[in-house]
Amino acid sequence: MEAISIFSDYQLQFFKRIGMKPKPIETLDDVSDVMKACSNVFSFENLDIVSNSCEPLNKDVLIKQVICNNQGGLCYKINTLLYHFLLEFGFKIHIIRGSVENQETHSDWNIPTGHMINIINFENRLYVVDVAFGCNLSLRPIPITDDGSEVVESCTGLYRVRKVENCVSGKYNYTHILEHRKLDSFLIESGKTWVTGYAFDPLLIVDNNNNNEKTTHQTLVQQLVIDDPTKEFSTKPLATKIVNDGSSFSIATLTANSFTLTDCKTGQKTKTNFDNDKSSFEQFNQHLISIFNLPPLKTIPPIFLN
């Protein structure tokens, strides 16, 4: 007689994709294990946008793209897949939309309401569960507090959430911000200062039951990224993820012009610049395959032809 699995087909697909042996996911430590496994596999990347191959999104499309076809994605893809995974394990979880602060100037907001975040309610406390904020990854749930007194540490830095007043982005008045800073071992002093990552309201829940791919929040956020006047994510290819060489963690970052490894502990960088001709596209694709385990781009984005 064939054994009856206690896991759904989607749960088994997700476990396989993140390279994790199936097990019940019941505690915050279990969620942390899943978040770490996600960071080992999922790349934060915008390749479908820069190659003009986007399609309307719902759960089935996301499974096809990220789980079956081994793609990565931005927050609206990866965090949504984690949402469905944890929801099937019975977690009280919902998705919200927040606004990311410009991580270079820290003076304005990038794409208001353009960041999709998971919030879980565990034992009557709220936590941020985000596996797709670039490589600023806490790798475990972050408690939502009033004063930011509970700090979570990962290989990428320190994270906290605190309550704020008069934090306005677009038409929204947010109630909380996520802040992050680098580890004490970081060699660049400015990196050890707390900065805002993004602002949000943990109770501003979006409807995630809509399966009409043309009108889902995932499709709407994707269109916000495409239409963003700064074109930060729509014209410049980017892939980034945490890599572990067995002794230390680094952040791998691939752009049209270069590949960079940044040591998470010290901030020291090793950078390889690509040739300034059409062979840079070939070098880009080689790194996509060898470092990020992503399928190569089939069409050349305009940035490589300039």
Curated annotation (Swiss-Prot):
It catalyses: an arylamine + acetyl-CoA = an N-acetylarylamine + CoA. It comes from the Eukaryota. InterPro entries: Arylamine_N-AcTrfase, Arylamine_NAT_domain_sf, Papain-like_cys_pep_sf. GO terms for molecular function: arylamine N-acetyltransferase activity. Keywords: Acyltransferase, Transferase. SUPFAM superfamilies: Cysteine proteinases (SSF54001). Gene3D superfamilies: 3.30.2140.20. Pfam families: Acetyltransf_2. Disulfide bonds: none annotated. Its EC number is 2.3.1.5. It is an enzyme of class 2 (transferase). The active site is at residues 75, 115, 130. The keyword Glycosyltransferase does not apply. Belongs to the arylamine N-acetyltransferase family. This is Probable arylamine N-acetyltransferase 3. It comes from Dictyostelium discoideum (Social amoeba).
